[in-house]
């Protein structure tokens, strides 16, 4: 039996920490297959990142991943709450003839915001970084 959806944190000798993420049916429900594979791949990576980081929250709360750019992909939003409910949204400006465009053309001049809101009375945390390179990972 192969599990379709799982998030498993692991640690090896207090040196290496990581998370194994597999979201087959969950990602399929979120991703709209009308977009080309390169766009869906970026969206799937965003969903996996959200599941990996958000699954480590200890209290009631929400972890959100927000990417904004001036490229073809305008917005990616994914959030995960403490009940392991995940949802996502992607906004693509024009998805005609973009199948072979590289990451840098799909997301250009981009910003990534990672937000943690834990509980009603806890302080909210936000990290902002410029999106550079050839991948959202």
Regions found by a protein language model. Name each.
Residues 2-118:
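N-terminal functional module of multi-domain proteins
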Residues 134:
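Conserved active-site/ligand-binding neighborhood in enzyme cores
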Residues 131:
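Active-site environment of non-heme Fe oxygenases that use a 2-His-1-carboxylate facial triad
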Residues 124-128:
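Short helix/strand-capping turn motifs
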